[in-house]
């Protein structure tokens, strides 16, 4: 069975919606406050979802457009994978090597230039190293990394797969 570009784009949109719904459920119904790294992971997931939604709605005929959309979606989810790797690494540090907790993301965005905020958040803080939720013995960042990695595989497949050449007749 050949999956159409539009079908796979729709699956990526659905994956983004499911991921964001679960994150918001944990935040608003289970009381888990997202740390700055969690928020950055959400940004990448939403970026991938928005690009996939545009690709789904546009349903490009041109292979060039298909590749551009797939590349942009891959960049978005790659951001989430990278931040999740950093998050998991912070959680595996010995307690004496965990960075101290800094101010919240809202304060940083209000008080500092964006470049400085990005540097500080990606450095991580003590709140990012704390494990507040586990499932089957793994923390939320580990599960997020697994989910994002699966989405990344689909995005890379969408980017690299062969598309049938559509020949149009000249009038």
From Swiss-Prot:
InterPro entries: DiS_bond_form_DsbB/BdbC (IPR003752), Disulphide_bond_form_DsbB (IPR022920), DsbB (IPR050183), DsbB-like_sf (IPR023380). GO terms for cellular component: plasma membrane. It holds the Pfam family DsbB. The chain crosses the membrane at residues 9-25, 44-60, 68-85, 143-161. Disulfide bonds join 35-38, 101-128. Keywords: Cell inner membrane, Cell membrane, Chaperone, Disulfide bond, Electron transport, Membrane, Oxidoreductase, Redox-active center, Transmembrane, Transmembrane helix, Transport. Residues 26-43, 86-142 are periplasmic. It is a multi-pass membrane protein. One of its GO terms (molecular function) is protein-disulfide reductase activity. One of its GO terms (biological process) is protein folding. Residues 1-8, 61-67, 162-171 are cytoplasmic. It is found in: Cell inner membrane. Belongs to the DsbB family. Required for disulfide bond formation in some periplasmic proteins. Acts by oxidizing the DsbA protein. This is Disulfide bond formation protein B. It comes from Acinetobacter baylyi (strain ATCC 33305 / BD413 / ADP1). The lineage of its organism: Bacteria, Pseudomonadati, Pseudomonadota, Gammaproteobacteria, Moraxellales.
């Amino acid at each position: 069975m050949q999956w159409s570009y539009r079908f796979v784009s729709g699956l990526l949109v659905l994956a983004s919606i499911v991921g964001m719904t679960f994150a918001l459920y944990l935040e608003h119904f289970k009381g888990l406050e997202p740390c700055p790294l969690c928020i950055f992971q959400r940004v990448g997931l939403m970026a991938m979802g928005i690009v996939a939604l545009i690709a789904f709605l546009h349903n490009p005929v041109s292979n060039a457009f298909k590749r551009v959309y797939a590349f942009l979606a891959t960049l978005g989810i790659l951001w989430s994978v990278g931040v999740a790797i950093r998050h998991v690494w912070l959680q595996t540090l010995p307690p004496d090597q965990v960075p101290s907790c800094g101010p919240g993301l809202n304060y940083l965005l209000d008080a500092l230039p964006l470049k400085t905020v990005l540097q500080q958040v990606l450095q991580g803080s003590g709140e990012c190293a704390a494990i507040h939720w586990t499932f089957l013995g793994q923390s939320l960042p580990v599960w997020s990394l697994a989910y994002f990695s699966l989405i990344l595989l689909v995005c890379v497949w969408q980017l690299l797969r062969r598309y049938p050449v559509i020949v149009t007749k000249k009038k």
